[in-house]
From Swiss-Prot:
Binding site for carbamoyl phosphate: 66-67, 116, 144, 147, 272-273
Catalytic activity line of the entry: carbamoyl phosphate + L-aspartate = N-carbamoyl-L-aspartate + phosphate + H(+)
Cellular component GO terms held in the UniProt record: cytosol
GO molecular function: amino acid binding; aspartate carbamoyltransferase activity
SUBUNIT field: Heterododecamer (2C3:3R2) of six catalytic PyrB chains organized as two trimers (C3), and six regulatory PyrI chains organized as three dimers (R2).
The organism of origin for this protein: Bradyrhizobium sp. (strain ORS 278)
Entry protein name: Aspartate carbamoyltransferase catalytic subunit
Gene name as annotated: pyrB
Length: 317
């Protein structure tokens, strides 16, 4: 069995509902604990027992492959009993409300609920109705805190720091919970954040979040240390936000020519799933400057760290 963690960090919050409200110390503590799990996950014995006897329920109202499987793996490696609740076959499909679902689940005494929902604020609402800890695995266009944490860990491991870096977040900022969480985290950690998108894909008043705004890739990528591409979320679009996928790629898709606008040692990220040929081409996505596969690896480590940090606050922990 693997050794106990060296970090004694305890997150001073019962839930992880977003990056908003986390301090620099909170973020740094989670990243430092995550580093231990990166090393653990590269060993033959990947098990710890910090969640032994605990029950983790993954409740996903939106389809997910990466996030749900990452949380499942994280919980099992920490010794938790993990249940994936199928929304498609649940009472929710039969008309049960979110609050009814929360009350029903709470009666089963889960220790940790990992929740993804299509509506912004739904996870926070559910958290008010349960006794255990709740982790937001993405709620509408609001937040996706563990994605921002894994992105920060990936950046820190490859650049040695976050503070002072120029980070360009490019694409469908309007519909992206990943963008919002990353902006909050990166600003807290002292990065210089720039969003790059056509006007139709920028939230009104985005400047108030403390970011620079660029509406073309040449300006947006100039001097960037990190280029973070976002998926074009057509499932959240009701109107014509972009003329066509091919035209979008022509102006805002990342290829080698546009990547050359950034610093020579710039690194490329994408939260996945990728639309190849829409927001990024395969040469860049699979190239030497890409961190996309590493982001997936960091995701398991970060989610293990979050689960452990919250578990330390549970009764009888």
């Amino acid at each position: 069995m693997a050794t106990s963690p060296k970090s004694t960090f305890v997150l001073g919050h019962r839930h992880l509902l977003g990056i908003e409200g986390l301090s620099t110390a909170d973020i740094t503590g989670l990243l430092d604990l995550s580093e231990e799990y990166v090393e653990l996950n590269r060993q033959v014995d990947k098990k710890r027992t910090v969640l032994r006897g605990r029950t983790q329920v993954n409740l996903f109202f939106e389809a997910s492959t990466r996030t749900q499987s990452s949380f499942e793996l994280a919980g099992k490696r920490l010794g938790a009993d993990v249940m994936n609740m199928s929304v498609s076959s649940s009472s929710i499909k039969k008309g049960e409300t979110l609050i009814d679902t929360a009350v029903t689940l709470n009666a089963m005494h889960p220790d940790i609920l990992v929740v993804r929902h299509h509506a912004s604020g739904a996870v926070e609402l559910l958290a008010r109705k349960v006794d255990g800890s709740v982790i937001n695995a993405g709620d509408g266009a609001h937040e996706h805190p563990t994605q921002a944490l894994l992105d920060a860990l990936t950046i820190r491991r490859n650049k040695g720091r976050i503070e002072g870096l120029v980070i360009a977040i490019c694409g469908d900022v309007l519909h992206s919970r990943v963008a919002r969480s990353n902006i909050l985290l990166l600003n807290t950690m002292g990065a210089r954040v720039r969003v790059v998108a056509p006007s139709t894909l920028l939230p009104p008043g985005i400047e108030r979040m403390g970011v620079e705004v660029a509406r073309d890739m040449r300006e947006g990528l100039n001097g960037a240390d990190i280029v973070m591409m976002l998926r074009l979320q057509r499932e959240r679009m009701n109107g014509s936000f972009v003329p066509s996928s091919s035209e979008y790629f022509q102006y805002f898709g990342l290829d080698q020519k546009k990547l050359a606008y950034a610093k020579p040692d710039a690194l490329v990220m994408h939260p996945g799933p990728m639309n190849r040929g829409v927001e990024i081409d395969s040469i860049v996505a699979d190239g030497a400057q890409s961190l996309i596969r590493e982001q997936v690896e960091m995701g398991v480590a970060v989610r293990m760290a979050v689960l452990e940090a919250l578990a330390r606050n549970l009764p009888n922990a």
